[in-house]
Regions:
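Short, contiguous acidic/charged loop-to-helix segments that flank catalytic cores in large enzymes
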Residues: 1, 162, 233-234
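Single conserved hydrophobic/aromatic residue that forms the stacking wall/gate
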Residues: 1-9
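Flexible, acidic/His-enriched mid-domain "rim/lid" segments that flank
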Residues: 10-105, 159
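Short, acidic (Asp/Glu-rich) active-site segment that either coordinates a divalent metal cofactor
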Residues: 40-44, 51, 55, 59, ...
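Solvent-exposed, amphipathic alpha-helical segments
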Residues: 68-79, 170-184
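Active-site cofactor/co-catalyst pockets and adjacent glycine-rich loops in catalytic enzymes
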Residues: 90, 94, 98-138, 145, ...
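Glycine- and charge-enriched low-complexity intrinsically disordered segments
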Residues: 170-179, 274-284
Length: 284
């Protein structure tokens, strides 16, 4: 039945044998490969480029998702105290999302203390200690199926040590500097050339990208930290009005005890970036 269905759908396709597929069961892929001379291509990039310019309705949905995320983050900020686990704190955002009609989370990125360096460790039952940094990335698919993707770094007790203040300030400077650069028609290559330079002792721990698109999840574009000849990514595109992008920063010294993760979500307007979230970037 599965093979017959694929054959029926494939018959009207033109002589062009390039077929881009977003999602397909293995039976369908096998049938296409075994019965037709199609060159199967991953459709993800094409679809994400097609939806990179957001409509007014999409912006409304995204703002609703961000409002829900901010409500949950504010409750997390109020609740954070030594003795609770990372998962207890993280559950507050999940509960808020579901209570307000939200959907799901792409990741489990909330970490405390030494788990904040390097980044990308998973939220766990680790007990948060006095004076520790707590960093998180929402990656939250909220109401109406749109993504709220912002990051904040708090500190238990709300008083940063000198070292914590240093890395938090660098991450803050990184986001603000790069956000100021972006305007319609700026090429990804030019952005990468002009972007804020990470401290040398933090480079090996850098976040995978400086900028990424966002819509119903993380999307195109994806602007990496370039290598010397710009061969490690696609820098050929340009920023366009009504794109929505996230500006990322992670500051964690190689071998350091803690790291700071900050990120904000912006709408590209004719005059530059318009911050979609109202939560202060320097909230600790």
């Amino acid at each position: 039945q599965e093979v017959t269905g694929v054959q029926t759908c494939a018959l009207p396709i033109s002589e062009n044998n390039n077929l881009a597929i977003d999602v397909c069961d293995p039976a369908g892929i096998n049938a296409l490969n075994n019965n037709y001379n199609y060159k199967i291509i991953n459709a993800q990039k094409f679809l994400e480029i097609a939806r990179s310019i957001k409509s007014e309705d999409e912006i409304i949905c995204m703002k609703a998702a961000l409002k829900t995320a901010e409500k949950g983050i504010s409750l997390m900020h109020e609740s954070l105290q030594a003795g609770m686990t990372e998962e207890e704190l993280w559950s507050i955002l999940h509960k808020t999302n579901i209570e307000n009609g939200g959907e799901w989370f792409e990741t489990r990125l909330l970490n405390s203390g030494p788990k904040t360096n390097p980044w990308f460790q998973e939220c766990s039952n680790r007990i948060i200690q006095k004076g520790e940094i707590v960093a998180f990335d929402t990656d939250m698919v909220g109401p109406y199926g749109y993504c709220a993707d912002i990051s904040r770094t708090f500190v238990e007790g709300r008083k940063l040590s000198n070292y914590q203040k240093k890395i938090h300030s660098l991450a803050y400077e990184n986001v603000k500097y790069n956000a100021e650069l972006i305007k319609p028609e700026l090429s990804f290559r030019e952005f990468a050339e002009k972007a804020w330079k990470l401290p040398e002792n933090c480079f090996d721990n850098h976040y995978p990208c400086q900028i990424h698109g966002v819509g119903m999840s993380d999307e195109w574009p994806f602007i990496a930290y370039p290598d010397k000849d710009y061969t490690n990514g696609d820098y050929s595109g340009i920023f366009k009005e009504n794109m929505v992008v996230c500006v990322e920063s992670y500051i964690g010294e190689e071998g350091g005890n803690e790291g700071a993760k900050l990120e904000d979500q912006y709408l590209v307007t004719k005059n530059g970036l318009d911050k979609l979230s109202s939560l202060p970037l320097d909230l600790i």
